[in-house]
Amino acid sequence: MNRDMETTIAGVRLKNPVTTASGTFGSGREYGDLIDLNHLGAITVKGVSDEAWKGNPVPRIAETSNGLLNSVGLQNAGAKHFIENDIPFLRQYDTKI
């Protein structure tokens, strides 16, 4: 059974409302073998800075009685790497970035 799940969020039309959480999905490369990225309405990529950023010093994660505290600090390879490597990878899928 096919259902029309198309929706608009902030003026952007998505084929469905299923998107990834910012930061936890990176650029999706690590998940391409696990799920069909074409089924997602959008991929919300990890934050990208102009220059490569190492993030915060360790320890970055602390366990609490109710879960984890995360302070990775937006570690990323920078905008040039994102444009040259991640965007071409993501464009092969029929989903919004």
Predicted regions and their residues:
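N-terminal capping/small domains of soluble enzymes
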Residues: 1-96
